[in-house]
């Protein structure tokens, strides 16, 4: 098995001290990238000047001298503007924005994903970007993997020029088709597993397989489906085990929560996608994050609800074997592809799975977009506050002036100065900012991560998020306002289904109370933040397993061993 890159060494010392601000790179009195006259390549963040000051002590570069021009950051960005014309925005995420892009010479249509450096709040975030670029550059070409053309960097962002996918998300396409069958699900799963096998053969573990990370290249009926995001991927060697909790909650394998896993987690995540493809809802669902984690650990699969009684035995057998809680008896990617249901996909039942499945898929997809948009409103548009107070708090707690705090020093210090912060919140802060897992927080990470978690975690922001959607200030979110916010260019018809569920009193509009209920149901909306999700599920993992280190017994299921 070939390894396409080198994975992060565990236990490396990555601590950095708070330092002075670093001025952005300029040339001829202007920003090289970021000004409006530079073809709209401004950074997407509207975080306040205070947050900018905090983040300005990041390393000057993310990719180092790996920019396509060979001369490093700023020169690479100038080269990008010579080679490519940047167009309209295609979408936004937690770390940046994606825009249309065109090769200035050939006219080829591409996409430019710009990752804002101000959004890279810790060295883990920086390493995620470095790894993503390294993996996309080194992974051999595959028809169902989006191709990275070039990577550039400037003072504000990392820019990835890649294939453009304009055919929409996987679930959106399924919902739009209307007629949806088991045979169609089998064809989709074959494609997904081809990608997983390709990654595993080349020593790459994806670690974040979910429907949102699969897009169609174009709107044609026979368009290829492509995986687009390698932001959490890692390279591995046979037999290597990992303990970093990553991924999206619904798709997380039990051994991830147990902090001892290998490439088998990608099979589990694909199995969750398959379950959703066949019935429209996730297999492991609860009203709280802890409930979701517990459901994943229990791994009970419900085959009683519709349409499971009419789903073929072959399909159910494959779901069971992909969602086997024991990673050592779970199917490999090759075994999934050899399973009769996949091998004979054209023989799978071509009977519609029913309108209920299609409706559930639509609701699941649109609701996720609603919650992600709410997260972006908080992360992007609400001002950062209390920066100086947080830095002063760190200095107060750091009585020995070492530039870092242990978890116990943090706990005791907060008690001494009268801050009544719940243990869970203290644990979350440590989990989010303790980069190398050695129980130590440095100043910069304490400040930046506590700001981020405070903003994301506080329910006081929900009224402001509600106001963002309520454009006309009527006190209600009306359907046209929701369409404008969630689907300005896409198929707006799918937004209508939100009202069937969220609009409890059926008055054709969403009140604040209805909005609040929707935001608190199922997976916490704040888990759309990769950093928040990591912190929450790290804390839950320690709580569920009482800080017991778990080992994998090759002859049987997961067993626990004391530290």
From Swiss-Prot:
Major location (coarse): membrane
Subcellular location: Membrane
Enzyme Commission identifier(s): 2.7.11.1
One Gene Ontology term, aspect cellular component: plasma membrane
UniProt KW Calcium keyword: yes
Region annotated Disordered, chain positions: 1-27
Amino-acid positions noted as binding Ca(2+) 2 in the UniProt annotation, renumbered to this chain: 470, 472, 474, 476, 481
Lipid moiety-binding residues (N-myristoyl glycine): 2
Entry text on domains: There are 3 contiguous domains conserved in the CDPK subfamily: a kinase domain, an autoinhibitory (junction) domain and a calmodulin-like domain. The autoinhibitory domain (348-378) inactivates kinase activity under calcium-free conditions.
Family to which this protein belongs: Belongs to the protein kinase superfamily. Ser/Thr protein kinase family. CDPK subfamily.
Protein name: Calcium-dependent protein kinase 29
Species in which this protein is naturally found: Oryza sativa subsp. japonica
Gene this chain is encoded by: CPK29
């Amino acid at each position: 098995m070939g390894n396409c890159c080198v994975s992060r060494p565990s236990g490396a010392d990555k601590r950095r001290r708070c330092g002075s601000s670093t001025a952005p790179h300029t040339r001829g009195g202007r920003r090289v990238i970021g000004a409006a006259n530079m073809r709209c390549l401004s950074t997407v963040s509207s975080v306040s000047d205070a947050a900018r000051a905090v983040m300005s002590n990041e390393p000057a570069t993310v990719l180092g001298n790996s920019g396509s021009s060979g001369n490093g950051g700023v020169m690479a960005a100038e080269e990008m503007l010579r080679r490519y014309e940047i167009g309209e925005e295609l979408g936004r995420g937690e770390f940046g924005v994606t825009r249309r892009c065109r090769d200035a010479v050939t006219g080829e249509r591409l996409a430019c994903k710009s990752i804002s450096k101000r959004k890279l709040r810790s060295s883990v975030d920086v390493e995620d970007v470095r790894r993503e670029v390294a993996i996309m550059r080194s992974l051999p070409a595959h028809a169902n993997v989006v191709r990275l053309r070039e990577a550039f960097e400037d003072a504000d962002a990392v820019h990835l020029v890649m294939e453009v996918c304009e055919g929409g998300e996987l679930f959106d396409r399924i919902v739009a088709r209307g007629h949806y069958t088991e045979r169609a699900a089998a064809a989709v799963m074959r494609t997904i597993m081809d990608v997983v096998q390709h990654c595993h053969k080349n020593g790459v573990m994806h670690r974040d397989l979910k429907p949102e990370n699969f897009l169609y290249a174009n709107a044609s009926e026979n368009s290829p489906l492509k995986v687009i995001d390698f932001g959490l991927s890692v390279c591995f060697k046979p037999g290597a085990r990992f303990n970093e909790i990553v991924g999206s909650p619904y798709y997380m394998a039990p051994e991830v929560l147990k902090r001892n896993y290998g490439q088998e987690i990608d099979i589990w995540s694909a199995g969750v996608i398959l379950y959703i493809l066949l019935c429209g809802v996730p297999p492991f669902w609860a009203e709280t994050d802890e409930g979701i984690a517990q459901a994943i650990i229990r791994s009970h699969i419900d085959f009683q609800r519709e349409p499971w009684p009419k789903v073929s035995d072959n399909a159910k057998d494959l779901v069971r074997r992909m969602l086997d809680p024991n990673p050592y008896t779970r199917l490999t990617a090759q075994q999934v592809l050899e399973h009769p249901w996949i091998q004979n996909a054209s023989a799978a039942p071509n009977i519609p799975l029913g309108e209920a499945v299609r409706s559930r898929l639509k609701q699941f997809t649109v609701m996720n977009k609603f919650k992600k948009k709410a997260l972006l409103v908080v992360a992007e548009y609400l001002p950062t506050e209390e920066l100086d107070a947080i830095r002063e708090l760190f200095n107060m707690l750091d009585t020995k002036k070492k530039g870092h705090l242990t978890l116990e020093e943090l706990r005791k210090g907060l008690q001494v100065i009268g801050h009544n912060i719940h243990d869970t919140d203290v644990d979350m802060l440590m989990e989010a900012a303790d980069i190398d897992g050695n129980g130590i927080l440095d100043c910069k990470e304490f400040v930046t991560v506590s700001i981020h978690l405070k903003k994301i975690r506080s329910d006081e922001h929900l009224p402001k998020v509600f106001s963002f959607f309520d454009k006309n200030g009527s006190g209600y979110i009306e359907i046209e306002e929701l369409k404008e916010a969630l689907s300005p260019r896409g198929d707006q018809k799918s937004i209508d289904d939100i009202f069937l569920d969220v609009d409890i009193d059926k008055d054709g509009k969403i009140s604040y109370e209805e909005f609040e209920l929707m935001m608190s149901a199922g997976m916490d909306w704040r888990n759309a933040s990769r950093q928040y999700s990591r912190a929450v599920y790290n804390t839950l993992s320690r709580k569920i397993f009482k800080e017991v280190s778990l080992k994998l017994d090759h002859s049987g299921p997961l067993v626990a061993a004391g530290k």
